Structures are given as C-alpha cells and as structure tokens.
Amino acid sequence: MKRILSLILAAALSFGVLALVGCGKKEEALKLGLGVHSTATVTNATEDVAGAGQATMTVAAVLVDENGKIVKCFIDCADSKVTYTADGKAVANASFATKYEQGDAYNMVQYGGAGKEWYAQADAFCALVAGKTLSEVKALVASDNKGTDEVINAGCTILVSEFVLAIEKAVESAVESDATAKDTLKVGVSTAQTTKDANEDADGYNQLETTFFAAAINGEGKIAAAKTECVQVKFTFDANGASTFDATKSILGKYEQGLDYNMVQYGGAGNEWYVQADAFCSAALGKTAGDVSALLGSDNYGTDIVKAAGCTILVDGFVKAASKAK
C-alpha cells in the first residue's frame, strides 16, 4: 500500500513540475496605436514649371505596455507630390512609394550628405524610443526640430519633430490588443490618385488617398493586432494652374475625424468610417498577408466575411496597405 501511495505521489509531483514548465510566463498583452501627422505645401503653375501639391504624411505605429511605455515603434513617411499645368490639366503619377519603401534608392546619403539613409535613421529613432513614455519621447526634440544629443548619438541626425507628433497620436489612440513584445510591428502604405482637369466653370483637382495599415505579426506570420487610417488630400487648382487649396488648414485622417467624417449622414452608410475600419481590422485578425488579400472580393467591397464583420465600404485601400505590412 505504501509503495502504491509513493508512486501516486511521485507521479503527481512530476505532473506538477511538467505543468509549470509547460505553462511558462504568459506574454503581456500590449496596446496597439497608429498615428499620422500630415502637412501640405502648394505652388502655382507657370508656363515653364508645373504647379504642385505635396502632402507629407508621417506615420507611427506603437506597441505600448500597461505603464504607458513604448515597447516597439515603426515609422514611415509618405511624401507624395502631384502636379498640374498652367492650362489647368492634372498630371497622373506613375506610382507612389514611401521613404521607407524606397530604401537605399531614396538617396539621402548621396544627395543630402547624410551619414545614413532615411530608413536607417527612422529605425534608429524607433530603437531609441523603446522603453520610453510619451513625455520622455517629446523631450527628445531639440529647439531646431532635430533630436537631442541622445538622438544624434543613436544615429538619427534628421528632423524628428514630425516623428514625435505622429508617435503622440499613436500613443494617445492606442487600444487593447492581443499583440505581445514577441510580435513584429509593421506599417503598410498604399496611395490612390484621382484627377480632374479644371475649366472656366470649375476647379480641377489632383487627389491623394493614402491608406495606412499597422499590424503586429506573430511568429506564424499571422496578424495578432491591426489598426488602419486613411488620409485624403484634394489639391485643387483653377483653369490657369493657380492653386485654390488652403494649405493652412489641418489635415486629419478619416479615423481621426470620428463622427465628424459624417459618412452616415452624407454617404448613407450604416456605420461611420472609423467603425467600418475597425470591422475590417477584426476580419483580418489571425490571417496572413496573403489571406488578407483574399478578402478583397470581386467588386472591391470585400467578401462575405468582411461584410459580416460590419465593413460594407470599399476595402481595396485596406487590402493593398495590409499586403505591404509584412
């Protein structure tokens, strides 16, 4: 009898040890935030030089812990320039690529005299802000909008003020998610352009619609958490190529506008844009970039999975941006 009890006790102890080893420490769930800071500049067309509208959209994605400290950060910048002629014709761009996407082809070292390319400096800044709170990140901006000595010594010598403004929006909008510190944080960016020539009765336009998709990718290559935003900038001009766009106004993303975007009131939608964007992100959870591409649907309005999740708007921008977040 004693031998039987001893065997039972030994088995119980062994099971307990194995259970403890197998469980391990559970990774802390982190908040995911996405922020976009946008500015615009314009010029008038002349007989010799096309007029231009340039939108600089700096995006930051962050993973934030329960103490408000940034665990991971990713930064990119969509610096998109469109043009129009002195006779009021809009010019279509062949393609758009962000500064990070361009990599070495951005040529900041060769033409700007920088020590490192833009993407390397952005990565250096992101590495530096890991472990810092928002207030500590704000303190990294020097009086000339470049970074403090701490930033420069980390390998980032370019202007960082817009990095910080984007990070501020990202941290302040961060929401609970299933992302952990083990996940890879990425942002995909896709830009669509629509144009219309001007005439004597109506202005023309050259419009940019840039979609940002932030994703925390787990070890299986699947999306553990996601957030999306879209910034629409409509550069207008008259029949003589003179800009009629007000570059002094603030540029806010559709998500950032919230109820003020008024898609329900003016577009007849069932839910506001930010609600539908969240619904798409929910449908993307647990999927790979390839799986997300399959959510497009034949009419660009999403598959039944997307619609059932509560997203009934065009999703091609979401899908194209998400496919790059890998």
Spans of features found by a protein language model:
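Sec-dependent signal peptide cleavage junction
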Residues: 15-30
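Active-site- and interface-proximal helix/loop "cap" or "latch" segments in soluble metabolic
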Residues: 26-326
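Intrinsic disorder/low-complexity segments
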Residues: 11-13, 20, 68
